[in-house]
């Protein structure tokens, strides 16, 4: 059993209030590895994709990879539901002037835990728009790290 750090800040601020980060216990060794999903958008292509993830095992993990070639525009709807413990890692790579709108709906049942971890790499002129809807009676966590590597790249949440 390991502890995952959620919302790790580069500088500890307001630490005395205990609001810098959250720790959750995670059993990576015994977690069910759900099939990886990939969505690719070719240069100048415009499309929409839907991804549904259900975590019914005691611990379940999934990786989603989104890759956009230069000039591509993609809208992705990620629907995640956890009856137990679910961790979804979304890796994003945006080429020059590519645009991604990522809409995530996360829900956790009363005994559930849903965790979303997004990493994104944005080239020059690329843009990521993130919309998150966090629902449920259980615990819901979200972590996001976006690298703006080129001029005029952007992130909106």
Short names for language-model regions:
Residues 1-35:
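Short, Gly/Pro- and small/polar-rich lid/capping loops
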Residues 26, 33-157:
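Conserved beta-strand/loop scaffold segments within soluble protein domains that form the structured core
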């Amino acid at each position: 059993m390991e502890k995952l750090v959620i919302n790790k800040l580069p500088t500890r601020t307001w630490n005395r209030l205990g609001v810098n980060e959250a720790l959750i216990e995670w059993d990576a060794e015994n977690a069910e590895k759900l099939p990886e999903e990939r969505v690719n958008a070719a240069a100048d292509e415009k499309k929409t994709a839907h991804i549904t993830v259900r975590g019914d095992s005691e611990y379940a993990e999934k990786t989603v990879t989104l890759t956009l070639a230069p000039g591509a525009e993609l809208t992705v709807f990620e629907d995640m539901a956890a009856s137990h413990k679910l961790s979804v890692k979304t890796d994003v790579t945006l080429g020059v002037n590519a645009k991604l709108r990522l809409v995530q709906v996360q829900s956790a049942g009363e005994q559930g835990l849903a965790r979303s971890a997004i990493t994104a790499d944005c080239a020059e002129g690329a843009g990521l728009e993130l919309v998150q809807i966090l629902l449920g009676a259980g615990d819901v966590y979200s972590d996001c790290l976006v690298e703006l590597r080129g001029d005029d790249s952007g992130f909106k949440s």
